[in-house]
Regions:
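Short helix-boundary/capping micro-motifs
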Residues: 10-28
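N-terminal winged-helix
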Residues: 29-30, 34, 80, 86-116, ...
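A short LG(V/I)-centered, amphipathic sequence patch enriched
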Residues: 40-59
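Alpha-helical linker/hinge and terminal dimerization helices associated
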Residues: 42-43, 64-86
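Short beta-strand-centered segments that line the small-molecule binding cleft or hinge
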Residues: 85, 107-111, 129-165, 169, ...
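Flexible hinge/capping segments at coil-to-helix
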Residues: 87, 154-165, 169-191, 275-276
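Beta-alpha-beta core module
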Residues: 152-158, 163, 225-272
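Secondary-structure junction motif
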Residues: 189-211, 275-283, 289-300
Length: 302
């Protein structure tokens, strides 16, 4: 049995399509089929039920799939460990980040790639739940986001800074002079709302579970930078974390005046998992970055 065969098996099991799996693996379909057949012969069992219309896993295939995934992940961990023992910062680093955290990441990405050019960064922007699922499957080395409201026992969170859910307006907006804001304050104003699934929207729905139908929602978007551009150039307001506009010209953040309005910026890792030296170095640089230090300072001095 070879790791390559397990890799081919896993991709075919995920797609249930030999042609699609072969394309994803950059091999010919005949090569893929040959390796799968060889694996079945070595294990003396069929892993797939094939006919002219479909491909399905057999019971043996279903049993093998999670074990094969774990074996492939462990093989990657072995390589990372050996490289770390040689004190090499190389290989790849898979980072998950929610859309709201984008402004916080940029400074560290630039500094890290200059300091460690042998490390390839793979950065995935997705919703919180998608990222937590990828982290639990060990498809990511760590995730940057606010602390989720749901419980993930397999994941541990390391605090970077505290923040508040805020109303974001342009600096000429009638609300821009306020130090705190209430739900009643925003009801007369048109709103560009973050879409469901974004952490700011999740936090707002938690703080004000019945408010949405009272509000003048003109649009919903799942792209934070576009939301900010719309607010900067119009009379619309939006609702995001205060951290999003730190050192951004033309916009003002007014925190909601409501109990429990705390959004905790975190690095999330798999509990008990081996952490690459490259990941440790990236997180160290992130913690020391101006973007994080200033947010942490502002949180302590509110």
């Amino acid at each position: 049995m070879e790791l390559r065969q397990l890799k081919y098996f896993v991709k075919t099991a995920e797609t249930l399509n030999f042609s699609e799996a072969a394309r994803a693996l950059f091999v010919t379909q005949s090569t893929l089929s040959q390796q799968i057949r060889q694996l079945e012969q070595e294990m003396d069992t069929l892993l797939f039920e094939r006919d002219s219309h479909s491909v399905q896993l057999t019971e043996s295939g279903e049993r093998l799939l999670p074990l094969a995934k774990r074996t492939l992940m462990d093989a990657v961990t072995c390589m990372d460990t050996v490289n770390d023992l040689k004190k090499m910062l190389s290989g790849s680093l898979n980072i998950g980040i929610t859309y709201t955290f984008a402004p916080i990441l940029t400074e560290t990405v630039i500094a890290f790639t200059k300091a460690h050019p042998a490390v390839k960064l793979n950065i995935f922007y997705k919703t919180m739940e998608e990222l937590m699922s990828m982290l639990e499957k060990r498809e990511l080395d760590f995730v940057l986001s606010f602390k989720p409201s749901s419980v993930h026992p397999a994941i541990e969170s390391h605090v970077l800074f505290d923040n508040n859910l805020s109303v974001i307006v342009n600096r000429y907006h009638p609300l821009a002079e306020k130090e705190k804001i209430t739900l009643q304050d925003i009801l007369p104003h048109g709103i560009a709302m973050p879409a469901k699934g974004l952490q700011s929207r999740n936090e707002f729905d938690k703080l004000y579970p019945s408010a949405y139908n009272q509000m003048k929602v003109r649009m919903e978007l799942n792209e934070v930078n576009v939301l900010l551009d719309i607010v900067r150039g119009s009379s619309l307001i939006t609702i995001l974390s205060e951290a999003v506009i730190h050192q951004t010209n033309g916009l003002v953040a007014i925190p909601f005046d409501v109990p429990d309005n705390i959004m905790v910026g975190c690095v999330h890792t798999e509990r008990g998992a081996y952490r690459k030296k490259a990941a440790e170095e990236f997180i160290r640089m992130l913690q020391e970055s101006e973007a994080v230090r200033e947010r942490a300072y502002n949180g302590l001095n509110k």
